[in-house]
Regions:
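Conserved anion-binding
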Residues: 104-124
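Hydrophobic faces of well-ordered beta-strands that scaffold small-molecule active sites
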Residues: 1-7, 26-30, 54-60, 81-85, ...
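Structural motif corresponding to the early beta-alpha repeats
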Residues: 25-96, 173, 198-200, 208
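Histidine-acidic metal/acid-base catalytic patches
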Residues: 1-3, 11-20, 65-74, 79, ...
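Surface-exposed amphipathic alpha-helices with a cationic face
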Residues: 47-51, 98-105, 127-128, 219
């Protein structure tokens, strides 16, 4: 697996975060939680250097579908491992947009994540048989927080999973440093399911020291 980290490790731009994460971290997830002129200006200035320094995945905005569309237009021709979207409540509008880009870009990975609620599963129910035609970013920490079975999720969607987001939970919130039981369970999944060497796993923590510690822990088999 390729182990990555988010672009929210230190106060600073996307490029400054990439400069800090170090060589042991093999890609950076660019967290783009909204889209406005300031975000576009920063990324336009930094994108060439970002691509020289690191492989990337991209997390598109979560606030408005219009911002998702605008951000996608910016990133669609960039070199990326995977693009992640959250589902939106207007399922028809979201599905129309998702399939309009995913069917056009069949050789590139554009995936839908399971957030900290039921919306992903409700969206799959809405899609019915077409749910087999989506790529999926499996968020391990969100499944733990929602007390959903990792095993059942993987069994249902295994052929569609293109990226995993890994973090822990304290029972009230996710994106916490995982306890040893969680780490052992995650290592077991990765070992038993025989993921490829270039499969992206993003550690979704927002603290540089914790991120580097978890990278070391995951590499210590």
């Amino acid at each position: 697996m390729l182990i990555g980290a988010t672009s929210w490790q230190i106060n600073g731009s996307y490029l400054k975060n990439i400069e800090q994460i170090g060589k042991d971290i093999q890609f950076c997830e660019l967290l783009v939680y909204t889209w406005n002129t300031n975000t576009e200006k920063i990324l336009s200035k930094e994108m060439d250097e970002i691509q020289k320094r690191s492989k990337i995945t991209i997390h598109l905005p979560t606030d408005k579908l219009e911002n998702v569309k605008n951000a996608y237009e910016f990133f669609k021709d960039k070199d990326y491992l995977n693009i992640t979207l959250h589902p939106f409540m207007n399922f028809k509008q979201f599905a129309d947009f998702y399939f309009s880009i995913s069917e056009k870009e069949k050789e590139r990975k554009i995936s839908i994540e399971n957030p900290e609620n039921d919306i992903f599963f409700e969206f799959c129910d809405y899609l019915k048989h077409k749910s087999k035609n989506i790529y999926i970013t499996m968020d391990y920490g969100h499944l733990l927080l929602d007390k959903r079975s990792i095993t059942r999720f993987y069994k249902r969607f295994s052929n569609q999973i293109t990226e995993i987001h890994f973090h822990g939970t304290n029972g009230k919130k996710s994106h916490c440093y995982p306890d040893q039981k969680t780490i052992k369970g995650f290592k077991k999944l990765m070992r038993e399911k025989d993921f490829s060497s270039d499969f992206p796993v993003c550690i979704e923590l927002f603290n540089l020291d914790e991120t580097k510690r978890l990278v070391a822990d995951l590499k210590n088999k």
